[in-house]
Regions:
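Solvent-exposed alpha-helices and their adjacent loops that cap or buttress functional pockets
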Residues: 38-40, 55-58, 76-80, 93-94, ...
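Intrinsically disordered, low-complexity, positively charged segments
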Residues: 1-56, 145
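Flexible glycine/proline-rich
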Residues: 12-21, 26, 39, 72, ...
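Structural signal for hydrophobic packing residues in well-ordered secondary-structure cores
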Residues: 2-9, 27, 93, 136-143, ...
Length: 387
């Protein structure tokens, strides 16, 4: 799948506040020292430290106050020996000063401050470039931008940034038996839960899919509909129609519109998956069984999404731990079962049939059971994938 996934190269420039969760398209390099000047880390007074030599409580050093500077101000003149400037936190340290004393440590008397102890060169002193030096790579190309990254980019003075275009994704379900929530449930029908699970999961992962509803069990109509999206989306996801039944239409759909990459994968649940290409569009047709479609979405589609978006790491988040519960079935093929993972313990719900979705609520992991594994007893050490 990843070999046929074309990373999106298109770049767009967006306002910084709209870049959260986006993939940075070019390195962000500091063009100036940050902070751009020496500054005070506290409210106090700046002066030359040499003037405090020998100062003590009984014989404090005296400095004449010649000005005041808040953050954002700039004291232009050089401060002579024996003089001090009052500074607020973040204010630039004036020329001629090499230390700052806390304002609560001094006594103000007759427009002078009395300093009761010696200070050293660069005491209470923040240097220009202490956070980031000019020329430093601040945020690397390919980084998924978090709130902290936005703060770094803002500190570089960037109001806009270049990011990868978001993957364009469409999602639909197949099946004449499906109705949308909110509609009357007629005899023989079921509500379409798959569409909502996968659309919601896509949004949780930061992707905004086009949710296209339900396609009929008619290969010609479904093929025509999906083909109409070939130039509009990078990835088309469907659920249902992938097994060998009379109305499993996705085989014929793929023959009509594109090239099949594979059908079936050696895992349970969700083995009957079809992957295909149609022009530049990649298609993944997942099982119609609710948990099977959810599991194969996580295992197969999620890495594709990461690759499309240009993320540098598409690996699963792996975990190891111990079973809190027994799993009574042998696994002749590789099997993934839902679980809740916390503090190194995997807890398995009582219901784990591929057609059941209810027990998936509250689960945050899939346990990976190798092929040829006998039933598992509680306490067995296992590996899993975190969702």
């Amino acid at each position: 799948l990843l070999e046929h996934t074309k990373k999106i190269e298109a770049v767009e420039e967006v306002p910084l506040l709209e870049a959260l969760g986006r993939i940075l398209a070019e390195d962000a390099v500091a063009t100036f020292d940050n902070p751009p000047f020496d500054r005070s880390p506290l409210d106090g007074y700046a002066f030359a430290a040499s003037g405090t030599k020998g100062a003590q409580k009984e014989a404090p050093a005296s400095f004449r106050i010649i000005g005041e500077e808040c953050a954002g101000d700039f004291f232009a003149q050089e401060v002579p020996e024996g003089a001090a400037v009052r500074l607020m936190t973040g204010a630039a340290i004036p020329k001629g000063c090499d230390c700052v004393v806390r304002q609560e440590d001094v006594t103000v008397q007759d427009e002078c401050i009395l300093v009761p102890y010696e200070l050293h060169h660069h005491e209470n002193y923040c240097f220009a470039g202490e956070d980031v030096r000019k020329g430093t790579l601040a945020v690397k190309r390919g980084t998924e931008l978090t709130a902290a990254h936005l703060g770094v980019l803002a500190s570089l003075g960037l109001g806009t940034v270049k990011v990868r275009r978001r993957p364009r994704i469409a999602i639909a379900s197949t099946g004449d038996e499906l109705v949308l929530p909110g509609e009357p449930l007629r005899p023989g029908k079921i509500y379409n839960s798959n569409l909502y699970v996968l659309a919601g999961r896509l949004r949780e992962l930061g992707f905004g899919p086009e949710v296209l509803g339900i396609l009929p069990d008619d290969a010609a109509k479904a093929a025509s509909f999906i083909a109409g999206w070939r130039e509009k989306v990078d990835l088309f996801l469907t659920t249902g129609g992938v097994s060998v039944g009379k109305k499993d239409i996705m085989h014929e759909v793929v023959r009509r519109i594109g090239t099949r990459l594979f059908w079936r994968v050696c895992i349970k649940p969700g083995a009957p998956v079809i992957a295909y290409t149609a022009g530049d569009m990649l298609g993944i047709a997942l099982s119609g069984n609710p948990f099977a479609s959810y599991a194969t979405f996580e295992l197969l589609t999620r890495p594709v999404l990461a690759a499309l978006a240009g993320r540098s790491d598409v690996a699963y988040r792996a975990a190891e731990g111990f079973l809190a519960d027994a799993f009574p079935k042998p696994s002749y093929g590789r099997r993934f079962i839902r679980a809740h993972y916390a503090d190194g313990i995997f807890s398995i719900p009582a219901q784990h049939d591929s057609g059941s979705l209810f027990s998936a609520a509250g689960c945050n992991a899939l346990i990976d059971i190798p092929a040829g594994t006998e039933p598992l007893v509680a306490g067995t050490r296992v590996k899993g994938v975190l969702l």
